[in-house]
């Protein structure tokens, strides 16, 4: 399970270093292979261990090619999906296309989301998290049915 937020630098080749605490698990359980794609709702990237991505692929495969919205989701999620193999130093290469989508520059935020990571441009992450925290006491959140029984 991936959790927490880590600030990471991107080198001049577009590589990021996966935090040390995740490397052994990713190598042992996922052969050090991850899949990176775009988030269709946010200006960030989604980084899945290979086995988790295979589950996502099955869900994408189950969508209809004849429904325009479902086909769009397949096209974007699968079309941008790129395998990233960790090197000996625990780094992965993010393609220029993926970096451009998320407007990634020198500093990024790697955000653990249980079975995957989100990769954000630093300033966009700060803005998004401020917006998310402000929503905490809003009527919209208080009236959300899915959250009414959530006990933390």
Swiss-Prot record:
Coiled-coil annotated spans: none
Gene Ontology CC: one annotated term: nucleoid
Disulphide-bridged cysteine pairs: none
CDD domains membership: MraZ_C (cd16321), MraZ_N (cd16320)
Matches recorded under Pfam families: MraZ (PF02381)
GO terms of biological process kind: negative regulation of DNA-templated transcription initiation
Location in or out of the cell: Cytoplasm, Nucleoid
Span of domain SpoVT-AbrB: 5-52, 81-124
Domain of life: Bacteria
Signal peptide (UniProt feature, chain positions): none
Quaternary organization: Forms oligomers.
NCBIfam families to which the protein is assigned, alphabetical: division/cell wall cluster transcriptional repressor MraZ (TIGR00242)
Name under which the protein is recorded: Transcriptional regulator MraZ
Organism: Actinobacillus pleuropneumoniae serotype 5b (strain L20)
GN (gene name): mraZ
């Amino acid at each position: 399970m991936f959790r927490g937020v880590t600030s990471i630098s991107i080198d001049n080749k577009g590589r990021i270093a996966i935090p040390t605490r995740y490397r052994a698990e990713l190598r042992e359980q996922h052969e050090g292979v991850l899949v990176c794609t775009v988030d269709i709702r946010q200006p960030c990237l989604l980084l899945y261990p290979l086995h988790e991505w295979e589950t996502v692929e099955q869900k994408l495969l189950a969508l209809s090619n004849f429904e325009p919205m479902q086909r769009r989701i397949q096209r974007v999620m699968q079309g941008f999906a790129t395998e990233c193999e960790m090197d000996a130093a625990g780094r992965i290469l993010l393609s220029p296309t993926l970096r451009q989508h998320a407007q990634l520059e020198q500093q990024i935020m790697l955000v653990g989301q249980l079975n995957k990571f989100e990769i954000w441009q630093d300033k966009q992450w700060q803005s998004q998290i401020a917006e998310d925290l402000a929503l905490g006491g809003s009527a919209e959140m208080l009236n959300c049915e899915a959250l009414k029984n959530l006990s933390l």
